[in-house]
Amino acid sequence: MALLCGLGQVTLRIWVSLPSQSENGIGFLAARAFLRSGGMEALTTQLGPGREGSSSPNSKQELQPYSGSSALKPNQVGETSLYGVPIVSLVIDGQERLCLAQISNTLLKNYSYNEIHNRRVALGITCVQCTPVQLEILRRAGAMPISSRRCGMITKREAERLCKSFLGEHKPPKLPENFAFDVVHECAWGSRGSFIPARYNSSRAKCIKCGYCSMYFSPNKFIFHSHRTPDAKYTQPDAANFNSWRRHLKLSDKSATDELSHAWEDVKAMFNGGTRKRTFSLQGGGGGGANGGSGGQGKGGAGGGGGGGPGCGAEMAPGPPPHKSLRCGEDEAAGPPGPPPPHPQRGLGLATGASGPAGPGGPGGGAGVRSYPVIPVPSKGFGLLQKLPPPLFPHPYGFPTAFGLCPKKDDPVLGAGEPKGGPGTGSGGGGAGTGGGAGGPGASHLPPGAGAGPGGGAMFWGHQPSGAAKDAAAVAAAAAAATVYPTFPMFWPAAGSLPVPSYPAAQSQAKAVAAAVAAAAAAAAAAAGSGAPEPLDGAEPAKESGLGAEERCPSALSRGPLDEDGTDEALPPPLAPLPPPPPPPARKGSYVSAFRPVVKDTESIAKLYGSAREAYGAGPARGPGPGAGSGGYVSPDFLSEGSSSYNSASPDVDTADEPEVDVESNRFPDDEDAQEETEPSAPSAGGGPDGEQPTGPPSATSSGADGPANSPDGGSPRPRRRLGPPPAGRPAFGDLAAEDLVRRPERSPPSGGGGYELREPCGPLGGPAPAKVFAPERDEHVKSAAVALGPAASYVCTPEAHEPDKEDNHSPADDLETRKSYPDQRSISQPSPANTDRGEDGLTLDVTGTHLVEKDIENLAREELQKLLLEQMELRKKLEREFQSLKDNFQDQMKRELAYREEMVQQLQIVRDTLCNELDQERKARYAIQQKLKEAHDALHHFSCKMLTPRHCTGNCSFKPPLLP
């Protein structure tokens, strides 16, 4: 703010009312509003990368309103940026203190007050309560709600420590290797020792060496360990609870330097606070990346659309969540290169991913290095996914969004931000897409949205990485990842990968719709290309995906690059499918299938599935050069999964009824046409006129044409083109691509079957064994490429197989149905990875004898499909049997449970009766005793009265009163 004002101090004596504000030129409040509205971003930009808010709380402190403490006046109001969030500060007792309540409600809003309080106590941070006057100042400054009754204020250093303990990386401070703190405690007789940070790797680590007996203790135990020296006096430790060592252990050197005492504070803050929910944001971006360094950045990139690299600042500002400012700064810091390729890192967390990303954008790397997570604005799902190795967790939902990323929320950021950053970003993306860092430039010529593989892909993928860095990184990561992990959506295949096609009828229907959708998508793609990724619904996926999906899985990662390739929106916008948004594929796979028939509105469909679809189908088709291959490659995976059904529908517009034939025969021509238009390499597809393709341009085509159409399905045509480019396209996939290419030629019906089997085990969906699955799958797919349906079918099968576990969208029955239709769909759009492989092969073949090959493929596919159908029927029966046995077991259990409950009720009744009887008896006994007591009491009373009251008789009486003393 100070910077904003250009004044060294934006000190507002809020009491002075507004005048003082106006004195500052930009009122404090006004400035604050400005910051809130995005001024921060501007600010950070001005500050320069170094200062961005992002790098660390410290780097932010520069936003402090005042310069020196000497200038601090009592109750002077200022604003400090903590982790990029403006926090109101007040000078109390000559010290600038921040409003803890405001910090809790902004930076730490994901934590409960309890957690925050406990952590604060554990860190030994004391809160200063403000006076009513100060509270009023804070209210007027907007830090506290009007209804607040009290507010604790902590120093900036304490606020940084508190936030760092929640949001910061869990890393020990950088200290010399053999460094040790000389510590003492005064519990009981007291003791002193050396606290060795290097040994402090868990809360119970024996890291303190006693200075007297040289034994090692954990901090918790050390405070209970004391040596009675002659001059020691016994002190009863107060509150020696599990957290107390931080209070009792002190540096023996009272005059330690600030640096040392801060390091000590940081060390004490480690392993504090029980379960530490790291902010997702950090993880999201960073986690994926290298977890810390590029963590924040990655997240920024992902969330902010990476800020689109250079354009990040402006771009980000628009849609970004709170962390936007950081992100922005970060990205900017990262420099146009693009944030670290969160994409790569995120995607695989491979070494390449981690370092590659940074590499691509040196600055990106730097920015990425931000250790502190950007404000954890992103959705909760983020971090986790990005952090997890995707392979292990196939996405439970069909769509990445499942993660709770709020696609809508981030969409603009992801989609818009990245695309906007498109050019810069784009170029990077292009590079990645192309399969080379060099690809960047090529990509850059593409429309911003599409151009950047990342940009385009990002649209859908939610800006994977930020810009060039991302692409380059993506490419590298993709390549690395590809080798390591197949490009298939294996990681989150379950969700989207299962391309549960809609029912056959629906498919044909959907196909028509798909065609329309494809057209819409194409338009969207064009828009996206123009730089309006948002429009594409891909953006939605992107948003969720961008942050989530991309990081989510290598497959996403691969996809990203592929998408990027495929994303060359250089293709005519209409033709160019939307940048393939890999994420959508994932989610789309099942979703599209299920709902395709339902969505009649082409535009809506395009928006909903188009992006994904296009991402799949179009992605590959779109990517004209190698990039396309790459994109297609990945896309196909997803395509095959999500797009497959969708695309198949789309292409099937013509051949709705017979997906197989249509896919390869009918679709082919269209696809070819569209593809050719879309990509120079698409000639093989060449069959269809743009018209059909346009409808679903690449999307439709891809979806429609197994391989022939766009890459979605077979990517056949496209993949073929890719054959040449596959290396580039597949660079991300590297070996896989090569293998695929090789295999593609090999593709044979058996492959399809094999592919199926493989898939069943892991399948792209399988995820856990992506590499293994991938190769075989790819192989099979390649072979099945020959059999258009084969591969698709195989892919289908796998997804199907996995479907039960992975696909949330379909019931087992549904699954079976989908599987049944799947083969058809698959044939229609064999976009599965296999598809891509076989697609390339098929495409290659198609180039020469598209129709002939297609016929063969059709026949083969049919056999394969029949096999698959039988397998599916068996599987279905098996599933039904299992379901029946489960049902029976459940019913038995219920009966047992009921019997048990009845028994319990009876026993309770008995117990109750028994207790009631006992109570009655007790009552009676008590009553009897009371009666007896009463009688005794009366008798006594009577007796004593007689004794004490002598009778005075008149007249002669034999009674003689006792002699009283």
From Swiss-Prot:
This is SKI family transcriptional corepressor 1. Residues 800-823 have a biased composition (Basic and acidic residues). The lineage of its organism: Eukaryota, Metazoa, Chordata, Craniata, Vertebrata. It comes from Homo sapiens. Residues 45-72, 278-367, 410-458, 530-592, 615-777, 796-843 are annotated as: Disordered. GO terms for biological process: negative regulation of BMP signaling pathway; negative regulation of transcription by RNA polymerase II; regulation of DNA-templated transcription. It comes from the Eukaryota. GO terms for cellular component: cytoplasm; dendrite; neuronal cell body; nucleus; transcription regulator complex. It is found in: Nucleus. Residues 641-650, 824-835 have a biased composition (Polar residues). Its main location: nucleus. Present specifically in cerebellar Purkinje cells (at protein level). InterPro entries: c-SKI_SMAD4-bd_dom, DNA-bd_dom_put_sf, SAND-like_dom_sf, SKI/SNO/DAC, Ski_DNA-bd_sf, Tscrpt_reg_SKI_SnoN. The gene is SKOR1. Acts as a transcriptional corepressor of LBX1. Inhibits BMP signaling. Residues 858-922 form a coiled coil. The keyword Coiled coil applies. Residues 283-312, 356-367, 418-442, 620-632 have a biased composition (Gly residues). The keyword Transit peptide does not apply.
